[in-house]
Amino acid sequence: MTTTELVALLHLASPALPIGAFSYSQGLEAALDANLIHDADSARNWIASGLTDVLAHGELPFLAHQLARWQAHDAPALAAENAWFVASRESSELRRETEQMGWSLAQLCASLEWGDAARRATLASLQPIALPTAFAYAAAAHDAGADAVLAAYAFGWVENQTAAALKAVPLGQLAGQRIIVALRDAIDAAVRRALATPADAVNTFAPQLGILSARHETQYSRLFRS
Protein backbone atom coordinates (compact mmCIF):
# COMPACT_ATOMS: atom_id res chain seq x y z
CA MET A 1 0.00 0.00 0.00
CA THR A 2 1.29 3.45 -0.90
CA THR A 3 1.20 6.37 1.50
CA THR A 4 -1.41 8.05 -0.71
CA GLU A 5 -3.69 5.00 -0.50
CA LEU A 6 -3.24 4.86 3.27
CA VAL A 7 -4.12 8.53 3.64
CA ALA A 8 -7.22 8.01 1.47
CA LEU A 9 -8.44 5.22 3.77
CA LEU A 10 -7.69 7.28 6.88
CA HIS A 11 -9.82 10.00 5.29
CA LEU A 12 -12.71 7.60 4.65
CA ALA A 13 -12.54 6.21 8.20
CA SER A 14 -12.30 9.66 9.79
CA PRO A 15 -15.13 10.88 12.04
CA ALA A 16 -14.68 14.21 10.26
CA LEU A 17 -16.05 12.71 7.03
CA PRO A 18 -19.29 14.69 6.47
CA ILE A 19 -21.75 11.81 6.14
CA GLY A 20 -23.54 12.06 9.49
CA ALA A 21 -22.19 8.94 11.20
CA PHE A 22 -22.13 10.73 14.56
CA SER A 23 -25.94 10.91 14.62
CA TYR A 24 -26.49 7.12 14.60
CA SER A 25 -25.93 4.48 17.29
CA GLN A 26 -27.10 1.40 15.31
CA GLY A 27 -29.14 0.01 18.17
CA LEU A 28 -26.67 0.82 20.96
CA GLU A 29 -28.97 3.44 22.48
CA ALA A 30 -31.87 0.98 22.49
CA ALA A 31 -29.62 -1.64 24.10
CA LEU A 32 -28.83 0.89 26.81
CA ASP A 33 -32.55 1.52 27.36
CA ALA A 34 -33.08 -2.25 27.66
CA ASN A 35 -30.29 -2.41 30.27
CA LEU A 36 -28.12 -4.58 28.03
CA ILE A 37 -25.49 -1.86 28.38
CA HIS A 38 -24.85 -0.17 31.71
CA ASP A 39 -21.08 0.32 32.07
CA ALA A 40 -17.78 0.16 30.19
CA ASP A 41 -17.55 -3.65 30.21
CA SER A 42 -21.07 -4.19 28.90
CA ALA A 43 -20.52 -1.49 26.26
CA ARG A 44 -17.34 -3.23 25.12
CA ASN A 45 -19.13 -6.58 24.98
CA TRP A 46 -22.00 -5.11 22.97
CA ILE A 47 -19.67 -3.49 20.44
CA ALA A 48 -17.53 -6.64 20.21
CA SER A 49 -20.64 -8.75 19.57
CA GLY A 50 -21.81 -6.37 16.86
CA LEU A 51 -18.41 -6.58 15.19
CA THR A 52 -17.95 -10.35 15.32
CA ASP A 53 -21.56 -11.57 15.04
CA VAL A 54 -23.08 -8.97 12.71
CA LEU A 55 -20.51 -6.93 10.78
CA ALA A 56 -18.14 -9.84 10.10
CA HIS A 57 -20.95 -11.95 8.59
CA GLY A 58 -22.81 -9.24 6.66
CA GLU A 59 -21.60 -5.72 6.08
CA LEU A 60 -17.88 -6.48 5.79
CA PRO A 61 -18.11 -9.36 3.28
CA PHE A 62 -20.72 -7.37 1.36
CA LEU A 63 -18.26 -4.46 1.23
CA ALA A 64 -15.51 -6.76 -0.06
CA HIS A 65 -17.70 -8.04 -2.89
CA GLN A 66 -18.91 -4.54 -3.78
CA LEU A 67 -15.28 -3.41 -3.95
CA ALA A 68 -14.59 -6.16 -6.49
CA ARG A 69 -17.69 -5.14 -8.48
CA TRP A 70 -16.50 -1.53 -8.65
CA GLN A 71 -13.02 -2.61 -9.68
CA ALA A 72 -14.51 -4.66 -12.52
CA HIS A 73 -17.24 -2.04 -13.12
CA ASP A 74 -19.93 -4.72 -13.12
CA ALA A 75 -22.91 -2.35 -13.08
CA PRO A 76 -25.69 -4.99 -13.11
CA ALA A 77 -24.16 -6.85 -10.14
CA LEU A 78 -23.61 -3.58 -8.27
CA ALA A 79 -27.25 -2.59 -8.71
CA ALA A 80 -28.63 -6.01 -7.74
CA GLU A 81 -26.44 -6.43 -4.67
CA ASN A 82 -26.96 -2.85 -3.52
CA ALA A 83 -30.74 -3.34 -3.71
CA TRP A 84 -30.41 -6.59 -1.76
CA PHE A 85 -28.45 -4.90 1.02
CA VAL A 86 -30.94 -2.04 1.36
CA ALA A 87 -33.80 -4.55 1.52
CA SER A 88 -31.95 -6.53 4.19
CA ARG A 89 -32.15 -3.70 6.74
CA GLU A 90 -34.48 -4.93 9.49
CA SER A 91 -36.02 -1.62 10.57
CA SER A 92 -36.90 1.71 9.03
CA GLU A 93 -34.20 3.42 11.11
CA LEU A 94 -31.45 1.09 9.92
CA ARG A 95 -32.61 1.48 6.33
CA ARG A 96 -32.71 5.28 6.54
CA GLU A 97 -29.27 5.23 8.14
CA THR A 98 -27.55 3.32 5.35
CA GLU A 99 -29.44 5.29 2.67
CA GLN A 100 -28.65 8.72 4.16
CA MET A 101 -24.99 7.97 4.80
CA GLY A 102 -24.63 6.25 1.43
CA TRP A 103 -26.18 9.22 -0.35
CA SER A 104 -23.97 11.69 1.52
CA LEU A 105 -20.80 9.75 0.68
CA ALA A 106 -21.85 9.34 -2.96
CA GLN A 107 -22.43 13.10 -3.21
CA LEU A 108 -19.01 13.73 -1.71
CA CYS A 109 -17.37 11.35 -4.21
CA ALA A 110 -19.12 13.10 -7.09
CA SER A 111 -18.21 16.57 -5.84
CA LEU A 112 -14.55 15.60 -5.43
CA GLU A 113 -14.62 13.80 -8.81
CA TRP A 114 -13.29 10.53 -7.42
CA GLY A 115 -13.25 7.79 -10.03
CA ASP A 116 -13.69 7.95 -13.78
CA ALA A 117 -16.74 9.37 -15.53
CA ALA A 118 -18.25 5.97 -16.37
CA ARG A 119 -18.10 4.76 -12.78
CA ARG A 120 -19.42 8.09 -11.48
CA ALA A 121 -22.40 7.66 -13.79
CA THR A 122 -23.04 4.21 -12.34
CA LEU A 123 -22.70 5.61 -8.82
CA ALA A 124 -25.31 8.27 -9.59
CA SER A 125 -27.70 5.63 -10.95
CA LEU A 126 -27.84 3.69 -7.68
CA GLN A 127 -30.89 5.11 -5.92
CA PRO A 128 -31.06 4.55 -3.00
CA ILE A 129 -27.45 3.67 -2.37
CA ALA A 130 -26.26 1.77 0.71
CA LEU A 131 -23.29 3.05 2.69
CA PRO A 132 -21.06 0.00 1.99
CA THR A 133 -21.67 0.40 -1.76
CA ALA A 134 -20.63 4.05 -1.65
CA PHE A 135 -17.66 3.26 0.61
CA ALA A 136 -16.53 0.53 -1.78
CA TYR A 137 -16.75 3.03 -4.65
CA ALA A 138 -14.57 5.56 -2.83
CA ALA A 139 -12.03 2.89 -1.92
CA ALA A 140 -11.91 1.53 -5.47
CA ALA A 141 -11.37 5.05 -6.80
CA HIS A 142 -8.18 5.17 -4.71
CA ASP A 143 -7.00 1.67 -5.72
CA ALA A 144 -6.99 0.45 -2.13
CA GLY A 145 -6.65 -3.26 -1.33
CA ALA A 146 -9.58 -5.18 0.12
CA ASP A 147 -7.98 -6.06 3.47
CA ALA A 148 -7.09 -2.44 4.21
CA VAL A 149 -10.51 -1.22 3.03
CA LEU A 150 -12.35 -3.60 5.34
CA ALA A 151 -10.05 -2.75 8.25
CA ALA A 152 -10.71 0.97 7.75
CA TYR A 153 -14.48 0.42 7.58
CA ALA A 154 -14.50 -1.81 10.66
CA PHE A 155 -12.33 0.58 12.66
CA GLY A 156 -14.58 3.49 11.71
CA TRP A 157 -17.60 1.48 12.86
CA VAL A 158 -15.97 0.58 16.19
CA GLU A 159 -14.90 4.17 16.74
CA ASN A 160 -18.39 5.48 16.03
CA GLN A 161 -20.00 2.90 18.32
CA THR A 162 -17.56 3.84 21.05
CA ALA A 163 -18.32 7.53 20.60
CA ALA A 164 -22.03 6.74 20.91
CA ALA A 165 -21.37 4.83 24.14
CA LEU A 166 -19.37 7.74 25.54
CA LYS A 167 -22.37 10.00 25.07
CA ALA A 168 -25.19 7.64 25.99
CA VAL A 169 -23.94 5.52 28.92
CA PRO A 170 -22.04 7.85 29.60
CA LEU A 171 -18.39 6.80 29.70
CA GLY A 172 -15.14 8.69 30.12
CA GLN A 173 -12.62 9.21 27.35
CA LEU A 174 -10.15 6.71 28.80
CA ALA A 175 -12.84 4.03 28.97
CA GLY A 176 -13.57 4.67 25.30
CA GLN A 177 -9.93 4.30 24.34
CA ARG A 178 -9.74 1.03 26.27
CA ILE A 179 -12.66 -0.32 24.24
CA ILE A 180 -10.98 0.58 20.95
CA VAL A 181 -7.66 -0.95 22.01
CA ALA A 182 -9.38 -4.11 23.27
CA LEU A 183 -11.05 -4.66 19.88
CA ARG A 184 -7.96 -4.40 17.67
CA ASP A 185 -7.56 -8.17 17.35
CA ALA A 186 -11.30 -8.59 16.86
CA ILE A 187 -11.17 -6.17 13.92
CA ASP A 188 -8.40 -8.24 12.34
CA ALA A 189 -10.36 -11.46 12.84
CA ALA A 190 -13.54 -9.90 11.43
CA VAL A 191 -11.71 -8.72 8.32
CA ARG A 192 -10.14 -12.14 7.74
CA ARG A 193 -13.50 -13.86 8.13
CA ALA A 194 -15.18 -11.40 5.77
CA LEU A 195 -12.54 -11.86 3.08
CA ALA A 196 -13.11 -15.62 3.19
CA THR A 197 -16.90 -15.32 2.84
CA PRO A 198 -18.31 -16.03 -0.65
CA ALA A 199 -21.01 -13.76 -2.04
CA ASP A 200 -23.77 -16.34 -1.57
CA ALA A 201 -22.88 -16.74 2.13
CA VAL A 202 -23.23 -13.09 3.16
CA ASN A 203 -25.64 -13.10 6.11
CA THR A 204 -27.28 -10.05 7.67
CA PHE A 205 -29.50 -12.02 10.09
CA ALA A 206 -29.47 -10.13 13.41
CA PRO A 207 -32.87 -10.48 15.11
CA GLN A 208 -31.94 -8.86 18.43
CA LEU A 209 -30.56 -5.82 16.64
CA GLY A 210 -33.67 -5.61 14.47
CA ILE A 211 -36.00 -5.78 17.49
CA LEU A 212 -34.02 -3.18 19.43
CA SER A 213 -33.91 -0.89 16.41
CA ALA A 214 -37.68 -1.17 15.96
CA ARG A 215 -38.20 -0.35 19.64
CA HIS A 216 -35.92 2.66 19.31
CA GLU A 217 -38.38 4.24 16.87
CA THR A 218 -40.78 4.86 19.76
CA GLN A 219 -38.25 5.16 22.59
CA TYR A 220 -39.23 8.04 24.87
CA SER A 221 -35.86 9.78 25.13
CA ARG A 222 -33.27 9.57 22.34
CA LEU A 223 -29.95 11.17 21.45
CA PHE A 224 -29.46 9.28 18.18
CA ARG A 225 -31.38 8.63 14.97
CA SER A 226 -30.92 4.85 15.23
From Swiss-Prot:
Required for maturation of urease via the functional incorporation of the urease nickel metallocenter. One of its GO terms (cellular component) is cytoplasm. PANTHER family: UREASE ACCESSORY PROTEIN F (PTHR33620:SF1). It comes from the Bacteria. Its main location: cytoplasm. GO terms for molecular function: nickel cation binding. It holds the Pfam family UreF. UreD, UreF and UreG form a complex that acts as a GTP-hydrolysis-dependent molecular chaperone, activating the urease apoprotein by helping to assemble the nickel containing metallocenter of UreC. The UreE protein probably delivers the nickel. Belongs to the UreF family. InterPro entries: UreF, UreF_sf. Disulfide bonds: none annotated. It is found in: Cytoplasm. The keyword Chaperone applies. Keywords: Chaperone, Cytoplasm, Nickel insertion. This is Urease accessory protein UreF. It comes from Burkholderia multivorans (strain ATCC 17616 / 249). The keyword Chaperone applies.
